[in-house]
Amino acid sequence: MDAAIVSQLSGPPALVRDAADLRPAGRGGYLLPRGYLSTRGSQIVDDRGRPVRIASIGWNGTDGPPGAAPSGIWTVSYKTVLDSIVDAGFNTVRIPWIDLGLDTPLHGYSDRLGWINTTLNPELLASDTPRTDGRYRYVTTLTAFRRIVDYAGEIGLKVIFDHHTNQGTAGQQRNGLWFDLGPGTDNTDGIAPGRFSAEMVKENWLRIAKTFAGNPTVIGYDLHNEPNGDRGHITWGGGGPTDIKAMCEDYGSAIQDVEPGVLIICEGPETYKPPPQSSGMDPTLAAPAGNLTAAGANPVRLKIANKLVYSIHEYPEEIADTKRWGIPETGKGFVDRMNATWGYLVRDNIAPVWIGEMGASLRTPETREWARNLLDYMNGKYGAEGGPTFSGDQQPISGSWWLIGPSNDPPYGLQTQWGVGHFRPDQIAVTDQMLFRPQK
C-alpha cells in the first residue's frame, strides 16, 4: 500500500478506553459504547472518537406483508431473541420495515404472517381482553418496534432500521426502487399496483426518526434495502427521480433535522451487468453486491458531516445467482471486484462501508471458500492484493450476518432452533470473525 495512504489511515494516536465502556457480549465480542456513533475517514467511531465495529445480525419477519410479526416469537419471547443475539457476540440488530406495515397491527394468527405466543410476549398485546372469536388484538408494527428498542437498550444492544420494501414483497422490491408510485416508476412495485411515492417514503422515515429521536439505542437508518440498478434504471447523480445519491441526500438530511445523532446508511445499487455511461457509475464494472464506484469522486453529502456510512450486500452464488453473469465469488476475481466497486472507499480512507447483509449455508466447499475470502477481506488480509488494511486501534470492516434463528432456505440461519444458544457450528465459526474486539 502507498505510504501516504498508510499515513492517512493511521489517524491520531490511540485513545485509551475506559474499562467501564468495555461491556462484553458473548463469544469474546463486545457491545458498543452507550452513545451515538460517527465516522472519521473510513472508520466508525464512538462519541469520544475511538474506532468501533458494528457487528450486527438481521432479524427478519417485519419485512413480510403488513401485519407480519418478527420471526421466532411463536416459540420464544422477543426479549429472548434479542438475548440470543448478544449471546452470539453481536452488538447490533438490523430490523426491516415496510411502508404498508408501520400502522398495521401484528396479525399473530397466521402461518403466512407469523404466530405470536401471547403468554411469552404480553407486551405485544393491544388489549388484555380477547375478541369475541377468542383471539387477541396486537399492537402495530411501529409500537412493536418501540418495545423491541426499549429492551435492546436495557441489555446494551444497538438497533439499525432498514427500509425493506414498500408493500412487503418477498426479497428485494421488484421494480428495483425505493418507491412504487409517481415519476420514475410504472406505478407498480413490480408486482402490485403502486401505493407509495418517494415523498411518502420520506415521510415514513421521518415518523420513525421522530419516534426514536434522542434514543442512542437506535444508531442507524439504512435508507433502502437492495436497490437494483438494472431494474430501476438507477443513476448516481443527475437529479432525476431515480437518482439514488439525491435520495440519500434528501432523506438523510431530513432525518438529521429530526435526529442528528444517527448514522445515515446508503446502499449502492446492485448492477449485475455494467451500467450505462449515463448512470454516473463506472460503465465497465458489474457490481452485484452494490455499485459504489461513483461514491469516491461524487459522494453523498449530508447536512451533518461524519454521519455517512455506505453499504453493500455480499452473498455467494447459492443466493446471489452470480455465475450466470460470469461474476466470480471467490479468489482473485472476487477480491478485485470488491476493491473496484466498494473496497477502495475503505482502503483509501474515504468513507466506511458496512456490509448490511452477508450469509451462506456453508454446506459446500464453494460457500465455505466464499466466507473465508470475505472475512479475510473484511479483516484486512488482502492488502497485497489491493484490499484495505488496518493498524493501531483501527477496526476492520463492519458487517451484518443474515440471519438470527433457523430458516428452511439458504443461508438457513445462525441457529438450529429459537432460543439462546443452539448455534450452527459452521456459521458461528464464521461470525466469530466479525465481532467487535476493541483495543484495550
Model regions and ranges:
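N-terminal carbohydrate-binding accessory modules
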Residues: 2-94, 105-120
